[in-house]
Amino acid sequence: MEKVLQGDVLRVGGIAHPVLVVSNQEFNQIMEVIVCPVLDDLSPNAIHPMITVRQQNTEKKTCIACEHLRHLDLKARKYTKLGSVNYSQMMDVCDILIALLEYR
């Protein structure tokens, strides 16, 4: 199985849409990940940031549904890596996740 990193975009068996890995490398080492869906039909807003997914020689703009966090066990599912997002965009997504979970 290919190593999964924070910022990777995966196609996972049994899930209709790609997902962005938001969990950190330490958590990902056990092949369990926390992900957010990558959805083409969303409009960018405060909780749906637009990202650019790098795939080999191409780039695709799409949105992340940050409010739909999921835990996946990659040991139990087939997956392929589609691409990744850059560090700056990953920081933006993590900032949104922190804001969504902030205690007030």
Question: Which residue ranges define each predicted feature?
Answer:
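Conserved functional hotspots at enzyme active or ligand-binding sites that engage polyanionic ligands
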Residues: 1-104
